[in-house]
Amino acid sequence: MAEEKNEGLVLLDFWVSPFGQRCRIALAEKGIPYEYSEQELLGAKSDLLLRSNPVHKKIPVLLHDGRPVSESLIILNYLDEAFRPDPAVSSSRNKLLLPSDPYAGAQARFWAAYSDKVYELGTRLWKLKGEARAQARAELLQVLTHLDGQLGDREFFGGEEFGFVDVAIVPFVPWLPSYERYGEFSVDEAAPRLAAWARRCAGRESVAGSLHPPEKVDEFITMLKKHYGIE
């Protein structure tokens, strides 16, 4: 049997996954070429995925010369470490996503990890009803308020440059209209600065090329509800 070739970068991903989209946006921002490998999540998972992430059996997984790196935020951090900027190259893509200052970097990691709650609580909105949904709504609004406050009046979470926290949060934006509908709230009202930030980010090439329209996300949620037998 011929030996399997594992050279360069391969991203094991699923088209609508916001966690995989974090990796796609980061790769685009840094101008790093890679191969995309679409994975099946609702059916039988590929042997490659199971071998690459035997613990969680989830995407995204980044294969670098055949060696797997799992979990989206760990992948983002890895890309910064493995593909450091070249001082001799002047390019907007020749950049670090994380701040070089240790404290600023720690804060960025905190807020990026905290943003996972948007997806977690949003999922509870469309899965649950009644009091449980109301609780998820209240918690999600609190998370959005915290993110809005952390952003403040800055253009991006790191200041003037699109960076680590922006990459972590922006893939959740196409999911927000569905969350608004199930939770009966408005992001524009609850977190106006965050809503304005989302509109600014939408025009970035890396973001526009990685995310899907909210309508496609809503169709996917509807499909998931049918798959799990949720009325």
Feature locations, PLM:
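GST-like domain detector, emphasizing the conserved glutathione-binding G-site
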Residues: 1-157, 161, 227-228
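Phosphate-coordinating loops and pocket residues in cytosolic domains that bind phosphorylated ligands
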Residues: 51, 203, 212
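Charge-dense, low-complexity polyampholytic segments
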Residues: 126-130, 186, 220
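GST superfamily/GST-like fold recognition
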Residues: 159-182, 186, 190-196
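Acidic/histidine-enriched, glycine/proline-rich intrinsically disordered or flexible terminal extensions
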Residues: 213-231
